[in-house]
C-alpha cells in the first residue's frame, strides 16, 4: 500500500513538472515568424504617348475674309493678279527636329508669306504625309491629346542671331511705342504681347481632319472638341491668321500702320501627359497659340521659321489709296500705276468660293 502511494505521488509529480515545462515554454520561448512589412506603393509611371511619324508636309496659305464667329470664307482666285491669293510650301522632315522648307516655283522670287492688314484672313492648312506619300493627319488627330502646333514671333533667325521685327517700309526695327501711344493702348513689353499686337490665330481643326466645311452653319458640328466639353481641341492643322494694324493713326494725324516683317516660328510640340489643363472659368482647355501652358511638360517635335511680310494695309484703299498702291508697288517691284492697272484688268472678284474654314 505504501509502495502504491509512493508510485502514484511520483507519477503526479512528473505530470506537474511536465505541465509546468509546457506552460513555461509557451511564454515566448518558441520562435515566432517575423511579420512581412507592407510594401510602399510606388507611383505609376506616366505612359509615354505614341509618337507622330511624318516625312513631308504640304502647306496651303489661302486668302479670305471674315464671316463672323471664327468662320473664314476663302476668296476666289483671280486670274492674272500679281498678288498670290494662294501660296504653297512644303516641309521635309530631316530628322532630329530639323525641317527643310521649300516654296512652290511661282513664289521663288518672293519666298515668304505675303500678307495684308486691314481685315483680310489667311487660312493655313497642313497636310502631313508618311514616307509613302499617304496622308497622316488622321493619326495626329488620334493623338491630339498630346500634340499642338504653336505660332509666335521668332526672336532669332535660323543662324541663332537676334532678329528684330522690322517695318517693311523703312527696313528699321518696329517702333513698339506706336502701339502703346495708340488708342486704345497696346502693351508690347513681352514677346507674348508683341505677338498679340502683330497677329491673331484661330484654331479650326475638325473631327475629320480632311473635312472641307461647306459653309458657316456646319462649323460647330465638325470642329474638334476636348472630350466631354464644347471647348476646342486645338491642334493647328487648320486655322487662320489676321494681321493687325492697331498702330494705324497712332498719333491721330493720319500716320500709317507699320508693316511687320518677321519670322513666324511654327512649332509642333508634344506633351508628356494630356495637354489639357483646367481653367477657372472655362474648364478643360488647350493652350493659346502663342504660349504653351507652363505647367505642362512639352518637348519640341519640330520647329521651322517662316518668313512673313505684311506688304500693305487694305484699309488704306478707302482713305489713303496712294499709300496702298505705293506699298504694293514696293513689294512687287512695279510702279503704283502698274499695280493698280493689274488689279483693274485681272479677273474680277466674287463671293462664290467653296472654301470655308
Briefly describe each language-model feature range.
Residues 41-83, 356-357:
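N-terminal segment immediately downstream of the Sec signal-peptide cleavage site
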Residues 170-250:
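Extended, solvent-exposed segments with strong compositional bias
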Residues 278-357:
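Short beta-strand elements
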Amino acid at each position: 500500500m505504501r509502495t502504491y502511494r509512493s508510485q502514484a505521488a511520483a507519477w503526479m509529480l512528473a505530470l506537474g513538472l511536465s505541465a509546468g515545462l509546457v506552460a513555461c515554454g509557451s511564454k515566448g520561448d518558441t520562435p515566432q515568424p517575423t511579420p512581412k512589412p507592407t510594401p510602399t506603393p510606388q507611383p505609376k509611371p506616366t505612359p509615354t504617348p505614341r509618337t507622330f511619324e511624318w516625312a513631308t508636309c504640304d502647306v496651303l496659305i489661302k486668302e479670305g475674309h471674315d464671316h463672323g464667329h471664327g468662320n473664314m470664307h476663302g476668296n476666289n482666285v483671280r486670274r492674272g493678279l500679281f498678288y498670290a491669293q494662294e501660296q504653297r510650301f512644303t516641309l521635309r522632315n530631316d530628322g532630329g527636329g530639323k525641317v527643310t522648307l521649300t516654296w512652290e516655283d511661282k513664289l521663288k522670287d518672293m519666298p515668304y508669306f505675303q500678307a495684308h492688314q486691314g481685315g483680310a484672313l489667311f487660312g493655313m492648312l497642313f497636310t502631313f504625309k508618311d514616307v509613302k506619300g499617304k496622308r497622316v493627319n488622321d493619326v495626329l488627330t488620334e493623338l491630339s491629346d498630346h500634340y499642338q502646333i504653336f505660332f509666335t514671333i521668332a526672336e532669332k533667325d535660323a543662324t541663332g542671331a537676334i532678329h528684330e521685327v522690322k517695318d517693311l517700309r523703312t527696313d528699321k526695327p518696329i517702333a513698339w511705342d506706336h502701339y502703346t501711344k495708340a488708342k486704345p493702348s497696346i502693351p508690347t513689353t513681352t514677346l507674348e504681347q508683341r505677338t498679340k499686337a502683330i497677329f491673331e490665330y484661330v484654331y479650326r481643326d475638325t473631327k475629320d481632319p480632311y473635312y472641307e466645311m461647306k459653309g458657316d452653319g456646319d462649323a460647330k458640328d465638325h470642329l474638334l472638341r476636348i472630350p466631354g466639353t464644347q471647348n476646342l481641341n486645338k491642334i493647328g492643322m487648320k486655322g487662320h491668321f489676321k494681321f493687325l494694324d492697331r498702330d494705324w493713326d497712332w498719333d491721330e494725324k493720319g500716320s500709317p500702320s507699320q508693316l511687320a516683317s518677321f519670322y513666324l516660328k511654327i512649332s509642333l510640340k508634344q506633351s508628356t501627359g494630356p495637354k489639357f489643363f483646367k481653367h477657372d472659368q472655362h474648364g478643360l482647355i488647350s493652350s493659346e497659340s502663342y504660349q504653351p501652358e507652363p505647367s505642362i511638360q512639352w518637348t519640341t517635335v519640330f520647329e521651322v521659321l517662316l518668313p512673313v511680310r505684311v506688304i500693305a494695309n487694305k484699309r488704306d484703299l478707302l482713305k489713303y489709296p496712294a499709300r496702298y498702291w505705293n506699298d504694293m508697288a514696293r513689294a512687287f517691284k512695279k510702279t503704283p500705276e502698274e499695280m493698280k492697272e493689274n488689279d483693274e484688268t485681272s479677273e474680277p472678284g466674287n463671293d462664290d468660293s467653296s472654301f470655308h474654314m
